[in-house]
Amino acid sequence: MWLDSSLQTWGPLVEVAEKQGQMLAIENVFEETPDTLLLLLSSFESPYFRFCFDTGHHNVFGKVPLSVWLEALAKYLAEVHLHDNHGEADEHLPVGEGKFDFTQFFALLSERKLSPIYTIEPHEEEHLWRGLEAVRKYLR
């Protein structure tokens, strides 16, 4: 039932994206595992329908290791939303100021030779500058 509804919702959007040469990326929000997103993405197998991994959402809601997520969805990864939290709420803290393991995350991306678009998601201006500084050390 969920998949049928999702296919009906996303199908027309994917068609438009393909015609216009624009990419759509679906983000993990409340998903505990990558299974539902993998099912949806693999149903289309479109180069214009991809995955956006949100580090903060994974830290709050993810129930399987980061490596499992990236193993399952690496071929679909187009973008990453970078922010941190303490695992209890979607705090949108700067990278490295919560409990998400960014060292492991960037190592996994490097091992798989993945180079997604990175978006820093601060909710305060000061967090932007601290976040940029923190991310620089991982992208050198």
Q: Language-model features: where?
A:
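Histidine-acidic metal/acid-base catalytic patches
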Residues: 19, 34-53, 58-140
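Active-site acidic/histidine proton-transfer and metal-coordination neighborhood
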Residues: 1-50
